[in-house]
A protein has these predicted regions:
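Membrane-integral, polyisoprenol-dependent glycosyltransferases
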Residues: 10, 21-223
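Short hydrophobic alpha-helical segments enriched in small aliphatic residues
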Residues: 13-15
Length: 223
């Protein structure tokens, strides 16, 4: 037993033996202070450079020849619903002409965003697809930033962005005047806000702990 081993070695020798084993096998704790500003700022700059490069690549793939194809100058597939409705929102004082409310299930935001592109470029392929292409490009940007923050790796974030660029569903959704890409963009942006909030609360918690205010109130520390 530990007691008999302690008696056979002697108290002092046994304690030195335990201390030696502890130093050998216990993993050293992490740093108690943040990294130097130089390395933090350098990584932040590199992260934004990589993000912007990948975003530019995404923009090229989303905007190149955006007006093609069309059905003899008219919308294709379900664009035939949303492009005219966006135009109605633009030309009808923000009101969509929807007799019988056949498509009332769709919220107006997506059609309003399509209308923005039509206001800039007219009723053509560029007009009804511009907002989708912009949302698809920004989707790549926020995915790179979210994954980089979660993985704490610029490389992993870059890989996520590249995979999203070449994803077929996202590529097509970004180049057609429909509502799917707007839903994907806003849901992903909401996730990004949650991740940022998580990191902010961790930072506040670390500050409270370092200042010794954990037990300042029976309801917990004020963050």
């Amino acid at each position: 037993s530990a007691c008999s081993h302690r008696l056979s070695l002697g108290a002092d020798a046994y304690d030195r033996h335990v201390a030696m084993l502890t130093e050998r096998f216990v993993v050293s704790p992490g740093p108690t202070s943040p990294a130097a500003d130089y390395y933090r700022d350098h990584d932040r700059l590199r992260g934004w450079i990589v993000t912007l490069v990948i975003t530019v690549i995404a923009a090229v793939t989303r905007f190149a020849m955006l007006r093609y194809p069309t059905d003899a100058g008219t919308p294709v597939f379900d664009e035939k619903h949303y492009a005219p409705q966006g135009w109605q929102v633009l030309t009808g004082g923000g009101v969509e002409d929807n007799p019988g409310y056949g498509l009332v299930v769709h919220p107006p935001v997506g059609k309003q965003l399509i209308a923005v592109g039509e206001a800039l470029f007219g009723y053509n392929g560029w007009g009804w697809r511009f907002s989708s292409a912009l949302a698809g490009t920004l989707l790549v940007l926020i995915v790179v930033r979210i994954v980089r923050r979660l993985a704490r790796s610029t490389l992993v974030g870059a890989i996520a962005g590249i995979l999203l660029i070449v994803d077929g569903v996202t590529f097509v959704s970004s180049r057609i005047g429909m509502l799917d890409i707007f839903l994907a963009f806003f849901v992903t942006a909401a996730l990004g806000c949650l991740v940022v909030d998580r990191d902010e609360m961790r930072r506040r918690y670390a500050t409270v702990r370092s200042e010794g205010r954990m037990a300042a109130s029976r309801f917990g520390p004020r963050m």
